[in-house]
């Protein structure tokens, strides 16, 4: 997508700090990972014009220990039965796939 090269990029605002913002020039198509302490991959540059996004935006990936950590407030889950299924061949959880 030549129209997206050398244009300014913008990233979704959130708790993470990225090296690319709307006031800096950067290459569109470079996926930026989140820098927050938890494994959440959801930040990605988008072109300022109407070009389609150059990368597939991966789904947020949160470790189970973060979701079920007792130090975080949990909703009313006392009556919910939790069953964990592990898919074979997934030794590396939360690995983002990008372009």
UniProtKB/Swiss-Prot annotation:
The keyword Acetylation applies. The keyword Acetylation applies. Interacts with hair keratins. It comes from the Eukaryota. Residues 3-59 are annotated as: 3 X 5 AA repeats of C-C-X(3). Sequence repeats lie at residues 3-7, 8-12, 47-51. InterPro entries: Keratin_matx (IPR007659). One of its GO terms (cellular component) is keratin filament. This is Keratin-associated protein 3-3. In the hair cortex, hair keratin intermediate filaments are embedded in an interfilamentous matrix, consisting of hair keratin-associated proteins (KRTAP), which are essential for the formation of a rigid and resistant hair shaft through their extensive disulfide bond cross-linking with abundant cysteine residues of hair keratins. The matrix proteins include the high-sulfur and high-glycine-tyrosine keratins. It holds the Pfam family Keratin_matx. Belongs to the KRTAP type 3 family. It comes from Mus musculus (Mouse). Keywords: Acetylation, Keratin, Repeat. The lineage of its organism: Eukaryota, Metazoa, Chordata, Craniata, Vertebrata. The modification N-acetylalanine is found at residue 2. GO terms for molecular function: structural molecule activity.
